């Protein structure tokens, strides 16, 4: 890190090119190449493959800049023109993408570390877990009325990405090089592949395009911090990490800001506004009325169109009342239900029955999306009927059982944050029978004959850790497992939503 600091401690007059010199450093590409060995890029690299030549990388950058100023197209369909000094330029261009992502991450790491210095913060590891969101939702959402279910727009123009990055990175040479890469990228129209409720990236250069997408989302989310700080004087710790930029509202002329700006801030002044995002989906909950949520919806659509110059469909934002509708988020169906209670008040001669109703946040396991994921991974059909997995038939019996058991344990652990997990019994049934059919297919036998020969060995692989504890402690108490499925259990290592298709 001392080598990195040398470029960031220059005089302010020399800071306009502080990133560009790092692109020509060999250890940057060693870190980028070894990114799979270490989760953090700031660990010391263990080495790199000798088949890469960093000298060729530096020469290639110079060659690209020359081509850019000569207005020649670098990427063509002719394989002979994709050679530079006898090397495949696509391979080294991918390395430059990865190296650029590493370089851009460095100033943010230094800025974040300096931001944490002198601040007393509880560094709790479990705050990184997705299960830490549900206690927050249970505490906050039970007092709210409406929620906006938002799908963040993804088809953003490449030049807007560069302009967004310009507010964070003060290096014109690096931005020109980035602009050239993006416009000459062969599949630039499919950098971010749209999905129904999420987003995905092409397998090549995932780190680089994920970084650009995070810039885009950060710029989009900064509007909430801006309005929050303008509408109230409450101190927000998270807002301190955002950097000042050109005020976006000056670019919106006609519909959104036709009234006085203070009046608009008064409309959006809501001390009970909460925002949560995961990947390409976010929720905005409020204690206000449906009129306020419709104004938020109208405002966000115009904000995307006027500031990001992208057309956004209003159907990407749904308004739902928490007491009547369920919210599909992170694989859970969450809602706020009225829990009735009756209190009997006894006086000297008379008694009264008082009915009360309290709001309770509830989360259920969404069985339909899970069956759809199992069907996509070829564990079952669309109706949930188990099928064999032919591609795993060449594995050993223990590997097959371990894979199926691991998939179920991951799904069970992820959905353990729900109070009602009885639908997981159906997922266990699908995976167990799919495992049995795969093994029977391998041994050219029937499922009944194979299960009779295997016995309870297959069953034990599909016990979660909690079930094993209760099963060993109370082997004859079958009701104990049922009580377990009515408890909320949180884990500190749930960093991503469980998807059976990722276990291929």
UniProtKB/Swiss-Prot annotation:
<dbReference type="InterPro" id="IPR024937">
    <property type="entry name" value="Domain_X"/>
</dbReference>
<dbReference type="GO" id="GO:0003723">
    <property type="term" value="F:RNA binding"/>
</dbReference>
<keyword id="KW-0819">tRNA processing</keyword>
<comment type="similarity">
    <text>Belongs to the intron maturase 2 family. MatK subfamily.</text>
</comment>
<dbReference type="GO" id="GO:0008380">
    <property type="term" value="P:RNA splicing"/>
</dbReference>
<dbReference type="GO" id="GO:0006397">
    <property type="term" value="P:mRNA processing"/>
</dbReference>
<keyword id="KW-0150">Chloroplast</keyword>
<dbReference type="InterPro" id="IPR002866">
    <property type="entry name" value="Maturase_MatK"/>
</dbReference>
<dbReference type="InterPro" id="IPR024942">
    <property type="entry name" value="Maturase_MatK_N"/>
</dbReference>
<dbReference type="GO" id="GO:0009507">
    <property type="term" value="C:chloroplast"/>
</dbReference>
<comment type="function">
    <text>Usually encoded in the trnK tRNA gene intron. Probably assists in splicing its own and other chloroplast group II introns.</text>
</comment>
<dbReference type="Pfam" id="PF01348">
    <property type="entry name" value="Intron_maturas2"/>
</dbReference>
<keyword id="KW-0694">RNA-binding</keyword>
<keyword id="KW-0507">mRNA processing</keyword>
<keyword id="KW-0934">Plastid</keyword>
<dbReference type="GO" id="GO:0008033">
    <property type="term" value="P:tRNA processing"/>
</dbReference>
<protein>
    <recommendedName>
        <fullName>Maturase K</fullName>
    </recommendedName>
</protein>
<dbReference type="Pfam" id="PF01824">
    <property type="entry name" value="MatK_N"/>
</dbReference>
């Amino acid at each position: 890190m001392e080598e990195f600091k040398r470029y960031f401690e220059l005089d302010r007059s020399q800071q306009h090119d502080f990133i560009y010199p790092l692109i020509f450093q060999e250890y940057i590409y060693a870190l980028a190449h070894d990114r799979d060995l270490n989760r953090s890029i700031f660990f010391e690299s263990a080495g790199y493959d000798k088949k890469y030549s960093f000298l060729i990388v530096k020469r290639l950058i110079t060659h690209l800049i020359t081509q850019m100023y000569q207005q020649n197209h670098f990427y063509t369909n002719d394989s002979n023109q994709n050679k530079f000094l006898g090397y495949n330029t696509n391979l080294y261009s991918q390395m430059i993408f990865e190296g650029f992502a590493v370089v851009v991450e460095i100033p943010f790491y230094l800025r974040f570390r300096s931001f944490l210095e002198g601040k007393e913060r509880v560094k709790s590891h479990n705050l990184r877990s997705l299960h830490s969101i549900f206690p927050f939702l249970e505490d906050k959402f039970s007092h709210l009325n409406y929620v906006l279910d938002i799908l963040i727009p993804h088809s953003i123009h490449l030049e807007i990405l560069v302009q967004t990055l310009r507010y964070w990175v003060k290096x014109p040479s690096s931005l020109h090089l980035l602009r050239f890469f993006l416009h000459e990228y062969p599949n630039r129209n499919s950098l971010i592949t749209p999905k129904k409720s999420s987003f995905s990236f092409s397998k090549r250069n995932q780190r680089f395009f994920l970084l650009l997408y995070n810039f885009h989302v950060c710029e989009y989310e900064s509007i909430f911090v801006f309005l929050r700080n303008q509408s109230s004087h409450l101190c927000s710790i998270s807002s301190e990490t955002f950097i000042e930029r050109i005020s976006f509202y000056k670019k919106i002329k006609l519909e959104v800001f036709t009234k006085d700006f203070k009046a608009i801030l008064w409309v959006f002044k809501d001390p009970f506004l909460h925002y949560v995002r995961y990947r390409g989906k976010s929720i905005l909950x409020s204690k206000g009325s449906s009129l306020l949520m419709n104004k938020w919806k109208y405002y966000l659509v115009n904000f995307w169109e006027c500031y990001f110059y992208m057309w956004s469909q209003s159907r990407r934002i749904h308004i739902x009342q928490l007491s009547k509708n369920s919210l599909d988020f992170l694989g859970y169906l969450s809602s706020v239900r009225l829990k009735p209670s009756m209190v009997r008040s006894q006086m000297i001669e008379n008694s009264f029955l008082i009915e009360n109703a309290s709001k309770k946040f509830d989360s259920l396991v969404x069985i339909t999306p899970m069956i759809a994921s199992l069907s996509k991974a070829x564990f079952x059909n669309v109706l949930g009927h188990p099928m064999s997995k032919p591609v795993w038939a060449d594995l050993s019996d223990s590997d097959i059982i371990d894979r199926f058991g691991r998939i179920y344990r991951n799904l069970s652990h992820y959905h353990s944050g729900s109070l009602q997990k009885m639908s997981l019994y159906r997922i266990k049934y699908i995976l167990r029978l799919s495992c049995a059919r795969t093994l029977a297919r391998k041994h050219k036998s029937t499922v009944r004959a194979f299960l009779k020969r295997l016995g309870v060995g297959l069953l034990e692989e599909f016990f979660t850790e909690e079930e094993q504890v209760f099963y060993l402690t109370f082997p004859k108490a079958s009701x104990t497992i049922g009580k377990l499925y009515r408890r909320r259990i949180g884990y500190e290592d749930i960093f991503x939503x469980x998807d059976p298709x990722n276990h291929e």
